[in-house]
Amino acid sequence: MAKVVVTGRDEEDGNRIVKDMTDKGQEAIFVLADVTKKAEIQAVVDKALEAYGQIDILYNGAGIHDAYDNAVELEEDLYDKLMAINVKAPYLASKAVIPHFIKQGRGVIINVGSQATQMAGPGGSAYVTSKHAVLGFTKQLAFDFGSQGIKVNILSPGFIETPMTDGIDDERLNRIPAKRAGKPEEIAALAVFLASDDSNYMHGSNVFMDGGWVLGRK
């Protein structure tokens, strides 16, 4: 069974997630951190090593959306915030754990993308740019470190039933070939596969779970 370190800036939410896991007999801790700050990311890594002795899997799941603004309408502050959370945070976390993976001779990094890794439209200028950047970063990590036993892939969900996608109307869902939003459990199952030995020959892959959204809109 996995031992999990949950991190983020929302202490209440983080503790809720950990309690939900521990109530089910799983082992987990929460470490409060701003994932855009190098020192705080390093503190999370240190805490994980102190608690569990090693790190095997890094899941870079932090992310925010924009207001579907084009480049002219987009405020610079929002652009900077998106780039910090969606792009800089995965870089900082990966930079912190990869030396440990190299020493172990193995490790897994799963970055979170979206349909916006492949197409325009699922967000505005900042969001689409950020997710294209995450895709490029994932590919380069896989290229640079795959020979050292480090597997890096990107999981790209579509509309999933989460607070981030609340308020999606039926008209938009009906344009998805599957005609529904995805479930968190479906994303979790895919993440487990990408973390497992069953996907060991996958390096730098962009794996979609989006109900067919990137195939085209009906």
Predicted segments, located by residue:
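Active-site helix of classical SDR
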Residues: 94, 130, 138
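Alpha-helical segment proximal to the catalytic Tyr-Lys
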Residues: 99, 143-147, 200
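Short C-terminal tail/terminal secondary-structure segment
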Residues: 68, 119, 192, 203-218
